[in-house]
Structure formats: structure tokens, C-alpha cells
Amino acid sequence: MPLSFLPKIIAKSLTDLTPELLRSRKIRLLMLDFDNTIVPYTTDVPTPEMAAWLEKMNKLEDIRLCIVSNSHKDRVPTFCRERGLDCITYARKPSGKGIRECLSRYGVPASEAALVGDQIYTDTLGANCAGVTSILVDAISNHNFWLKARHVLELPFILIARNRRMKQ
């Protein structure tokens, strides 16, 4: 797959993604980054809006959810167990290891899957290299210097992707 830092879809938040949008793109498997996409790095408690979105989406029969995280801590599996969600940790994004494992687990081709995350250099690049639809969302929190710096470095790719989308 091509090496691309440009997301296919940009959304403000994970909660902005609707079943209708995903169905229109023929997405049957939605892989979700965890940190700063579902919850901030500093807590494992989602906002009420995020909790409601996860619950609603997890009840859908035609779109499956799986958290695909680079985290190697117990917080992701614990979060998922409490909410009836599946997860893959140690995903090693941007390598396709965790993404391919998820596709195989669900028996879904890459063309019918998407990965949502807040980072271009891990989530978007990993999704694009694996051939799944990349969806970039705003980070929930830029609580330290390195997160702010990373987002500044990602800004040119975001602007190019937005400009490309406006021309379509």
C-alpha cells in the first residue's frame, strides 16, 4: 500500500462518526485508537457523550468495533472488558501488525475497514499502509509540550487533506 500521511476522512471527534457515514463508505469494521481518541492519556473514564457513542455503536450488528492500541498497559483491556468491547494491544502502529491481526480476527477485507485515531504519524500512516480507510479526529487533550509539538508537525498534512476534500 502507498506511504501516505493524508487521512481519507477528517472529523472533529469520534462521536461525529455516524453509522450512516460508515455504511455509505461500506465500513463493516471500525478500529479505534484509545489514548486521546476515546479518553485522554490522564484518565480511563470517557465523557458521557463518548460512553453513549461507544454503547450505541457496539450494539450495531453490521459494524463491528475493536480498539487497536499501541499501549502495553492493562488499562485498555480493563476498559474494554467493562464495556463489552474487543481490543488488540501492542499494535505497533504505524506497522500494520495490529491492524492485520484485527482484520484477520473479524474476517473483514481492508477495503471494508477503517481506523480512527488522533495521530497522523501512527494512526493515519498505519491505516493507509494497511489499505484501510484512515479517519483522523482531533486529539481529546494536548496536555503536554510533546503532544502540542507533534500536532504542529502534523498540521501541513491536515491542511492538505482538508484542501483535497474541498476540491472533490
Model-predicted segments: where are they?
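Asp-based, Mg2+/Mn2+-dependent phosphohydrolase catalytic module
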Residues: 2-32, 39, 43-44, 48-115, ...
